[in-house]
Protein backbone atom coordinates (compact mmCIF):
# COMPACT_ATOMS: atom_id res chain seq x y z
CA UNK A 1 0.00 0.00 0.00
CA UNK A 2 3.03 2.30 0.33
CA UNK A 3 3.20 3.19 -3.34
CA UNK A 4 -0.57 3.70 -3.53
CA UNK A 5 -0.39 6.12 -0.59
CA UNK A 6 2.50 8.07 -2.11
CA UNK A 7 0.78 8.30 -5.48
CA UNK A 8 -2.47 9.56 -3.96
CA UNK A 9 -0.73 12.03 -1.64
CA UNK A 10 1.35 13.54 -4.45
CA UNK A 11 -1.52 13.61 -6.96
CA UNK A 12 -4.07 15.17 -4.61
CA UNK A 13 -1.61 17.64 -3.07
CA UNK A 14 -0.38 18.94 -6.42
CA UNK A 15 -3.84 19.04 -8.00
CA UNK A 16 -5.68 20.72 -5.15
CA UNK A 17 -2.86 23.21 -4.50
CA UNK A 18 -2.88 24.17 -8.19
CA UNK A 19 -6.66 24.42 -8.38
CA UNK A 20 -7.03 26.47 -5.21
CA UNK A 21 -4.01 28.64 -6.00
CA UNK A 22 -4.36 29.13 -9.77
CA UNK A 23 -7.65 27.82 -11.17
CA UNK A 24 -9.87 29.46 -8.54
CA UNK A 25 -8.41 32.97 -9.01
CA UNK A 26 -8.48 32.58 -12.81
CA UNK A 27 -12.09 31.41 -12.81
CA UNK A 28 -13.28 34.12 -10.44
CA UNK A 29 -11.60 36.92 -12.38
CA UNK A 30 -9.09 37.65 -9.63
CA UNK A 31 -6.34 37.17 -12.21
CA UNK A 32 -7.16 40.01 -14.59
CA UNK A 33 -6.60 39.94 -18.32
CA UNK A 34 -7.05 36.18 -18.76
CA UNK A 35 -9.47 35.36 -21.62
CA UNK A 36 -12.01 32.52 -21.18
CA UNK A 37 -10.13 30.21 -23.57
CA UNK A 38 -6.96 30.62 -21.53
CA UNK A 39 -8.92 29.80 -18.38
CA UNK A 40 -9.99 26.52 -19.98
CA UNK A 41 -6.36 25.65 -20.69
CA UNK A 42 -5.40 26.59 -17.13
CA UNK A 43 -8.11 24.27 -15.80
CA UNK A 44 -7.19 21.46 -18.19
CA UNK A 45 -3.57 21.54 -17.05
CA UNK A 46 -4.68 19.82 -13.84
CA UNK A 47 -5.14 16.63 -15.87
CA UNK A 48 -1.36 16.15 -15.95
CA UNK A 49 -0.98 15.77 -12.19
CA UNK A 50 -1.92 12.06 -11.94
CA UNK A 51 0.86 11.29 -14.44
CA UNK A 52 3.24 13.42 -12.37
CA UNK A 53 2.10 11.42 -9.34
CA UNK A 54 3.10 8.21 -11.13
CA UNK A 55 6.50 9.64 -12.08
CA UNK A 56 7.23 10.82 -8.55
CA UNK A 57 6.12 7.53 -6.99
CA UNK A 58 8.08 5.35 -9.39
CA UNK A 59 11.23 7.43 -8.95
CA UNK A 60 10.97 8.05 -5.20
CA UNK A 61 10.37 4.37 -4.38
CA UNK A 62 12.95 3.12 -6.92
CA UNK A 63 10.21 1.21 -8.69
CA UNK A 64 11.43 2.16 -12.14
CA UNK A 65 9.19 2.07 -15.17
CA UNK A 66 8.62 -1.63 -15.60
CA UNK A 67 4.99 -2.55 -16.35
CA UNK A 68 3.89 0.95 -17.38
CA UNK A 69 0.71 -0.39 -19.05
CA UNK A 70 1.20 1.61 -22.24
CA UNK A 71 2.01 -0.93 -24.94
CA UNK A 72 -1.07 -2.90 -26.11
CA UNK A 73 -0.95 -6.68 -25.92
CA UNK A 74 -1.50 -7.25 -29.65
CA UNK A 75 -3.12 -5.51 -32.59
CA UNK A 76 -5.70 -8.19 -33.41
CA UNK A 77 -6.88 -8.55 -29.82
CA UNK A 78 -6.67 -4.88 -28.93
CA UNK A 79 -8.00 -3.12 -32.02
CA UNK A 80 -11.71 -3.92 -31.46
CA UNK A 81 -11.49 -2.57 -27.92
CA UNK A 82 -9.70 0.58 -29.05
CA UNK A 83 -12.69 1.04 -31.38
CA UNK A 84 -15.04 0.58 -28.42
CA UNK A 85 -13.07 3.19 -26.49
CA UNK A 86 -13.16 5.57 -29.47
CA UNK A 87 -16.79 5.31 -30.57
CA UNK A 88 -18.53 3.78 -27.54
CA UNK A 89 -18.86 7.00 -25.51
CA UNK A 90 -20.58 8.86 -28.37
CA UNK A 91 -22.99 5.97 -28.97
CA UNK A 92 -23.82 5.65 -25.27
CA UNK A 93 -24.23 9.42 -24.95
CA UNK A 94 -26.67 9.46 -27.88
CA UNK A 95 -28.68 6.58 -26.41
CA UNK A 96 -28.81 8.25 -23.00
CA UNK A 97 -29.87 11.55 -24.56
CA UNK A 98 -32.58 9.77 -26.56
CA UNK A 99 -33.95 8.24 -23.34
CA UNK A 100 -33.91 11.68 -21.72
CA UNK A 101 -35.79 13.30 -24.62
CA UNK A 102 -38.34 10.46 -24.59
CA UNK A 103 -38.98 11.19 -20.92
CA UNK A 104 -38.95 14.98 -21.47
CA UNK A 105 -40.12 15.43 -25.09
CA UNK A 106 -40.93 19.11 -24.49
CA UNK A 107 -37.20 19.76 -24.05
CA UNK A 108 -36.24 18.37 -27.47
CA UNK A 109 -35.42 20.97 -30.12
CA UNK A 110 -34.25 19.39 -33.40
CA UNK A 111 -33.69 22.84 -34.93
CA UNK A 112 -31.26 23.79 -32.12
CA UNK A 113 -32.97 27.19 -31.95
CA UNK A 114 -31.61 28.08 -28.51
CA UNK A 115 -28.00 27.52 -29.55
CA UNK A 116 -28.55 29.18 -32.93
CA UNK A 117 -29.95 32.30 -31.26
CA UNK A 118 -27.16 32.36 -28.69
CA UNK A 119 -24.49 32.06 -31.38
CA UNK A 120 -26.10 34.83 -33.42
CA UNK A 121 -26.16 37.10 -30.37
CA UNK A 122 -22.47 36.46 -29.72
CA UNK A 123 -21.67 37.25 -33.35
CA UNK A 124 -23.75 40.42 -33.24
CA UNK A 125 -21.83 41.58 -30.17
CA UNK A 126 -18.67 41.57 -32.28
CA UNK A 127 -20.35 43.36 -35.18
CA UNK A 128 -20.92 40.25 -37.29
CA UNK A 129 -24.15 38.89 -38.71
CA UNK A 130 -24.66 35.16 -39.19
CA UNK A 131 -27.71 33.67 -40.94
CA UNK A 132 -29.52 30.97 -38.98
CA UNK A 133 -28.80 28.33 -41.64
CA UNK A 134 -25.07 29.07 -41.45
CA UNK A 135 -25.07 28.77 -37.67
CA UNK A 136 -27.01 25.49 -37.85
CA UNK A 137 -24.45 24.01 -40.23
CA UNK A 138 -21.61 25.23 -38.01
CA UNK A 139 -23.15 23.56 -34.97
CA UNK A 140 -23.88 20.30 -36.78
CA UNK A 141 -20.30 20.21 -38.08
CA UNK A 142 -19.10 19.96 -34.48
CA UNK A 143 -20.68 16.52 -34.06
CA UNK A 144 -18.51 14.48 -36.49
CA UNK A 145 -15.50 16.40 -35.20
CA UNK A 146 -16.39 15.34 -31.65
CA UNK A 147 -16.80 11.70 -32.70
CA UNK A 148 -13.85 11.19 -35.03
CA UNK A 149 -11.19 13.69 -33.95
CA UNK A 150 -11.75 14.63 -30.30
CA UNK A 151 -10.61 11.25 -28.90
CA UNK A 152 -7.15 11.54 -30.43
CA UNK A 153 -6.83 15.33 -30.10
CA UNK A 154 -7.66 15.08 -26.39
CA UNK A 155 -5.27 12.21 -25.71
CA UNK A 156 -2.39 14.52 -24.77
CA UNK A 157 -4.25 15.65 -21.65
CA UNK A 158 -6.35 12.55 -21.00
CA UNK A 159 -3.24 10.37 -20.95
CA UNK A 160 -2.08 12.56 -18.07
CA UNK A 161 -5.02 11.29 -16.06
CA UNK A 162 -5.28 7.76 -17.38
CA UNK A 163 -1.66 6.78 -16.82
CA UNK A 164 -2.36 7.66 -13.20
CA UNK A 165 -5.81 6.15 -12.71
CA UNK A 166 -6.15 3.15 -15.04
CA UNK A 167 -2.42 2.78 -15.64
CA UNK A 168 -1.36 2.78 -11.98
CA UNK A 169 -3.96 3.19 -9.22
CA UNK A 170 -6.56 0.63 -10.38
CA UNK A 171 -4.04 -2.19 -11.03
CA UNK A 172 -2.25 -1.44 -7.75
CA UNK A 173 -5.46 -1.51 -5.69
CA UNK A 174 -6.59 -4.69 -7.47
CA UNK A 175 -3.62 -6.54 -5.95
CA UNK A 176 -5.13 -5.90 -2.50
CA UNK A 177 -8.88 -6.05 -3.21
CA UNK A 178 -11.26 -7.88 -5.49
CA UNK A 179 -12.30 -6.18 -8.71
CA UNK A 180 -15.72 -4.89 -7.58
CA UNK A 181 -14.51 -2.99 -4.49
CA UNK A 182 -11.43 -1.91 -6.46
CA UNK A 183 -13.54 -0.16 -9.08
CA UNK A 184 -15.99 1.29 -6.57
CA UNK A 185 -13.23 2.72 -4.36
CA UNK A 186 -11.02 4.02 -7.17
CA UNK A 187 -14.07 5.56 -8.86
CA UNK A 188 -14.93 7.48 -5.69
CA UNK A 189 -11.29 8.55 -5.34
CA UNK A 190 -11.35 9.83 -8.91
CA UNK A 191 -14.56 11.73 -8.22
CA UNK A 192 -13.16 13.31 -5.06
CA UNK A 193 -10.05 14.34 -6.98
CA UNK A 194 -12.39 16.53 -9.08
CA UNK A 195 -13.97 18.09 -5.96
CA UNK A 196 -12.38 21.57 -6.15
CA UNK A 197 -13.59 21.96 -9.74
CA UNK A 198 -17.00 20.53 -8.89
CA UNK A 199 -17.36 23.15 -6.16
CA UNK A 200 -16.92 25.98 -8.68
CA UNK A 201 -19.39 24.47 -11.14
CA UNK A 202 -17.62 21.82 -13.23
CA UNK A 203 -20.36 19.61 -14.80
CA UNK A 204 -23.06 20.44 -12.23
CA UNK A 205 -23.04 24.22 -11.80
CA UNK A 206 -23.43 26.01 -8.48
CA UNK A 207 -27.07 27.04 -8.20
CA UNK A 208 -28.56 23.79 -6.92
CA UNK A 209 -29.94 23.31 -3.37
CA UNK A 210 -27.41 20.67 -2.29
CA UNK A 211 -24.33 22.61 -3.48
CA UNK A 212 -21.57 21.56 -3.26
CA UNK A 213 -21.99 18.11 -1.69
CA UNK A 214 -24.67 17.01 -4.15
CA UNK A 215 -22.41 17.79 -7.10
CA UNK A 216 -19.44 16.05 -5.51
CA UNK A 217 -21.55 12.94 -4.82
CA UNK A 218 -22.92 12.96 -8.39
CA UNK A 219 -19.41 13.34 -9.77
CA UNK A 220 -18.24 10.37 -7.70
CA UNK A 221 -21.09 8.25 -9.09
CA UNK A 222 -20.29 9.37 -12.65
CA UNK A 223 -16.61 8.55 -12.12
CA UNK A 224 -17.43 5.07 -10.79
CA UNK A 225 -19.52 4.33 -13.89
CA UNK A 226 -17.06 5.81 -16.39
CA UNK A 227 -14.14 4.29 -14.48
CA UNK A 228 -15.58 0.81 -15.03
CA UNK A 229 -15.85 1.47 -18.77
CA UNK A 230 -12.29 2.80 -18.99
CA UNK A 231 -10.90 -0.02 -16.85
CA UNK A 232 -12.63 -2.59 -19.03
CA UNK A 233 -11.04 -1.34 -22.25
CA UNK A 234 -7.70 -1.15 -20.43
CA UNK A 235 -7.98 -4.78 -19.33
CA UNK A 236 -8.99 -5.96 -22.79
CA UNK A 237 -6.12 -4.11 -24.52
CA UNK A 238 -3.50 -4.23 -21.79
CA UNK A 239 -2.92 -0.51 -22.35
CA UNK A 240 -4.08 2.65 -20.60
CA UNK A 241 -3.93 4.31 -24.04
CA UNK A 242 -7.37 2.78 -24.65
CA UNK A 243 -8.61 4.50 -21.50
CA UNK A 244 -7.03 7.77 -22.64
CA UNK A 245 -8.83 7.52 -25.98
CA UNK A 246 -12.11 6.67 -24.24
CA UNK A 247 -11.65 9.55 -21.81
CA UNK A 248 -10.97 11.89 -24.73
CA UNK A 249 -14.09 10.62 -26.48
CA UNK A 250 -16.21 11.29 -23.40
CA UNK A 251 -14.82 14.80 -22.97
CA UNK A 252 -15.30 15.56 -26.65
CA UNK A 253 -18.94 14.47 -26.84
CA UNK A 254 -20.22 15.11 -23.32
CA UNK A 255 -22.05 18.35 -24.18
CA UNK A 256 -23.31 17.38 -27.65
CA UNK A 257 -26.88 16.64 -26.57
CA UNK A 258 -27.26 20.15 -25.17
CA UNK A 259 -27.43 21.42 -28.75
CA UNK A 260 -30.90 19.89 -28.99
CA UNK A 261 -32.21 20.98 -25.58
CA UNK A 262 -34.64 23.88 -25.23
CA UNK A 263 -33.81 24.50 -21.58
CA UNK A 264 -30.21 23.34 -21.37
CA UNK A 265 -31.37 20.35 -19.36
CA UNK A 266 -30.49 19.49 -15.80
CA UNK A 267 -26.93 18.25 -15.19
CA UNK A 268 -28.18 15.84 -12.53
CA UNK A 269 -30.78 14.38 -14.91
CA UNK A 270 -29.79 14.90 -18.56
CA UNK A 271 -29.44 15.08 -21.48
CA UNK A 272 -25.69 15.08 -20.78
CA UNK A 273 -24.27 11.72 -19.62
CA UNK A 274 -23.31 13.24 -16.25
CA UNK A 275 -27.02 13.03 -15.40
CA UNK A 276 -28.79 9.90 -14.17
CA UNK A 277 -31.00 9.60 -17.29
CA UNK A 278 -28.54 11.03 -19.79
CA UNK A 279 -25.99 8.58 -18.42
CA UNK A 280 -28.39 5.62 -18.31
CA UNK A 281 -26.73 3.82 -21.24
CA UNK A 282 -23.33 4.21 -19.60
CA UNK A 283 -24.75 2.81 -16.36
CA UNK A 284 -26.23 -0.27 -18.06
CA UNK A 285 -23.07 -1.02 -20.05
CA UNK A 286 -20.87 -0.44 -16.99
CA UNK A 287 -22.99 -2.92 -15.02
CA UNK A 288 -22.48 -5.59 -17.70
CA UNK A 289 -18.76 -4.83 -17.86
CA UNK A 290 -18.41 -5.05 -14.09
CA UNK A 291 -20.30 -8.34 -14.09
CA UNK A 292 -17.98 -9.70 -16.78
CA UNK A 293 -14.87 -8.60 -14.88
CA UNK A 294 -16.23 -10.23 -11.72
CA UNK A 295 -17.02 -13.43 -13.64
CA UNK A 296 -13.52 -13.54 -15.09
CA UNK A 297 -12.03 -12.96 -11.65
CA UNK A 298 -13.99 -15.89 -10.18
CA UNK A 299 -12.93 -18.10 -13.08
CA UNK A 300 -9.29 -17.06 -12.67
CA UNK A 301 -9.15 -15.57 -16.18
CA UNK A 302 -9.11 -11.86 -15.33
CA UNK A 303 -5.91 -10.59 -16.94
CA UNK A 304 -5.53 -7.32 -15.07
CA UNK A 305 -2.37 -5.53 -16.27
CA UNK A 306 0.34 -5.24 -13.63
CA UNK A 307 1.53 -1.75 -12.75
CA UNK A 308 5.14 -1.41 -11.66
CA UNK A 309 6.48 -3.69 -8.93
CA UNK A 310 5.21 -5.03 -5.58
CA UNK A 311 5.75 -2.70 -2.61
CA UNK A 312 8.70 -4.66 -1.26
CA UNK A 313 10.54 -4.88 -4.60
CA UNK A 314 12.67 -2.26 -6.35
CA UNK A 315 14.31 -2.26 -9.77
CA UNK A 316 17.64 -2.86 -7.98
CA UNK A 317 16.24 -6.09 -6.54
CA UNK A 318 15.39 -7.24 -10.05
CA UNK A 319 18.89 -6.43 -11.23
CA UNK A 320 20.40 -8.54 -8.41
CA UNK A 321 18.07 -11.47 -9.00
CA UNK A 322 19.80 -14.50 -10.54
CA UNK A 323 19.18 -14.92 -14.24
CA UNK A 324 17.60 -18.21 -15.24
Question: Can you annotate each of these PLM segments?
Answer:
Residues 4-16, 83-93:
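Alpha-helical transmembrane segments
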Residues 1-4, 77-79, 177-181, 212, ...:
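Membrane-helix interface segments
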Amino acid sequence: MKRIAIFLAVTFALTWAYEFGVVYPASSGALTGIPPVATQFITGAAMFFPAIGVLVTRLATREGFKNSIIKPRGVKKSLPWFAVAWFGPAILSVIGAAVYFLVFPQDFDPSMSAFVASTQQQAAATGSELPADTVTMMLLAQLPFAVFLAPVLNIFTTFGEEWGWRGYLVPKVSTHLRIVPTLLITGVIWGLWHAPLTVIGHNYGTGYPTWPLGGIAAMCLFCVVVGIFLTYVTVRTGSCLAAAIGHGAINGFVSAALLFSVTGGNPFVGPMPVGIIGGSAFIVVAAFMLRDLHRREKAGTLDMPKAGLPDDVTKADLARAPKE
